[in-house]
């Protein structure tokens, strides 16, 4: 199937040509309210399943294995933010004391819920995560309720033993490079992404294509590549030097040696 990489490349070309507000802008950036806020929650998939099968963020099979396994969720556009909310982490807790646990569950945003509420914050959780909102023995009855009121707040992402990694998307070439960001501690979201080629001093802005995917068109692009990330919420910056090697390959993942601090 070559349609997906072709679509990514087309989107990247269109975005390169657009002139408008840059994703670099850091004014008015702030981490989402750390206080508990009201929302609603539903669940999807099998009762004890992982939920998403990849999702609109583009994480693919990562959602099926630890550390994302059974911790993923979809959100409505309020928190999805056209894909820039991908990777953010939230604590979610339900409210009915007769059936709900006092403990909150941690949810990693990996998908968008197009059928969810457009006006109020809505989490669509995996069956496994939704069940963990209940006290012991009440997971089934809680799932039977379908839609429940919850409270949520932003929390720091923590991928123990993991550093930020960059997955080279299928179809990438020396003239079109698309990267997916994985395992970002702290805020978890990306506001802008820049790339620096071998022997260069200039950082080139990458374009946000969709989900957690970013791209650049130019050519020929020469590795190794250094990558600079700026978080969406607070504008924190991190640079991974020569993280993508000279002989990089499509569908390969390259881990850095660093990560953001696992705090907000």
Curated annotation (Swiss-Prot):
Disulfide bonds join 57-86, 89-157, 94-100. The keyword ATP-binding does not apply. It is found in: Secreted, Cell wall; Membrane. Residues 175-256 form the Expansin-like CBD domain. Residues 1-25 form the signal peptide. SMART domains: DPBB_1. One of its GO terms (biological process) is plant-type cell wall loosening. Keywords: Cell wall, Cell wall biogenesis/degradation, Disulfide bond, Membrane, Secreted, Signal. GO terms for cellular component: extracellular region; membrane; plasmodesma. Residues 54-162 form the Expansin-like EG45 domain. It is a peripheral membrane protein. Pfam families: DPBB_1 (PF03330), Expansin_C (PF01357). InterPro entries: Expan_Lol_pI, Expansin/allergen_DPBB_dom, Expansin_CBD, Expansin_CBD_sf, LolPI, RlpA-like_DPBB, RlpA-like_sf. Its main location: secreted. The keyword Cell wall biogenesis/degradation applies. May cause loosening and extension of plant cell walls by disrupting non-covalent bonding between cellulose microfibrils and matrix glucans. No enzymatic activity has been found. Belongs to the expansin family. Expansin B subfamily. This is Expansin-B3. The gene is EXPB3.
